[in-house]
Curated annotation (Swiss-Prot):
Its cofactor is Mg(2+). It catalyses: Endonucleolytic cleavage at a junction such as a reciprocal single-stranded crossover between two homologous DNA duplexes (Holliday junction). Binds 2 Mg(2+) ion per subunit. It comes from Yersinia enterocolitica serotype O:8 / biotype 1B (strain NCTC 13174 / 8081). Homodimer which binds Holliday junction (HJ) DNA. The HJ becomes 2-fold symmetrical on binding to RuvC with unstacked arms; it has a different conformation from HJ DNA in complex with RuvA. In the full resolvosome a probable DNA-RuvA(4)-RuvB(12)-RuvC(2) complex forms which resolves the HJ. NCBIfam families: ruvC. The RuvA-RuvB-RuvC complex processes Holliday junction (HJ) DNA during genetic recombination and DNA repair. Endonuclease that resolves HJ intermediates. Cleaves cruciform DNA by making single-stranded nicks across the HJ at symmetrical positions within the homologous arms, yielding a 5'-phosphate and a 3'-hydroxyl group; requires a central core of homology in the junction. The consensus cleavage sequence is 5'-(A/T)TT(C/G)-3'. Cleavage occurs on the 3'-side of the TT dinucleotide at the point of strand exchange. Transmembrane segments: none annotated. GO terms for cellular component: cytoplasm; Holliday junction resolvase complex. GO terms for molecular function: crossover junction DNA endonuclease activity; DNA binding; magnesium ion binding. Its EC number is 3.1.21.10. It is found in: Cytoplasm. This is Crossover junction endodeoxyribonuclease RuvC. Belongs to the RuvC family.
Length: 173
């Protein structure tokens, strides 16, 4: 059994999702958003760090999975996203959680079946896979999808010494 915390980083809204994996069964434990309403970037980063730390303390996850930075059209947006990711990652590392990163396309491919999926498709599939009564809000659904991706890929992956990764089917990664 493992508990996985997924994070969809953002400088204004950071989504989180927590699931438990037992074999192939995934169970929803919680999700939501850390909202930063201040304009001051250092204060936003502090709020993200504190929020992620609180979530880790509450749910005691075994793994931390986060979305990688994508190249935005606006370089300023990409920099802010990178800073938000950094605040969340530092919270995880400070609490000794192993960190895994996944590209948005890889998450969509794993959860929906196509890397070009729309947000509504991700929400629908997360709802279906976790047997939720309603679609989660978009940022929380993305975070849950990241956690689901981690569970799916970790089932097919063996960890070797020196952090080398080899897929169970024999393909080097």
């Amino acid at each position: 059994m493992a508990i996985v915390l997924g994070i969809d980083p953002g400088s204004r809204v950071t989504g989180y999702g927590v699931i438990r994996q037992q074999g192939r069964q995934l169970t929803y434990l919680g999700s939501g958003c850390i909202r930063t309403v201040v304009d001051d970037m250092p204060t936003r980063l502090k709020l993200i760090y504190a929020g992620v730390t609180e979530i880790i303390t509450q749910f005691q996850p075994d793994f931390f999975a986060i979305e990688q930075v994508f190249m935005a059209k606006n370089p300023d947006s990409a920099l802010k996203l990178g800073q938000a990711r950094g605040a969340a990652i530092v919270a995880a590392v400070n609490l000794n959680l192993p960190v895994s990163e996944y590209a948005a396309r890889q998450v969509k491919q794993t959860v929906v079946g196509t890397g070009a999926a729309e947000k509504s498709q991700v929400q629908h599939m997360v709802r279906s896979l976790l047997q939720l009564p309603a679609n989660p809000q978009a940022d929380a659904a993305d975070a849950l999808a990241i956690a689901i991706t981690h569970c799916h890929l970790s089932q097919n992956t063996l960890r070797l010494g020196n952090d080398q990764m080899v897929l169970a089917r024999g393909r080097l990664r």
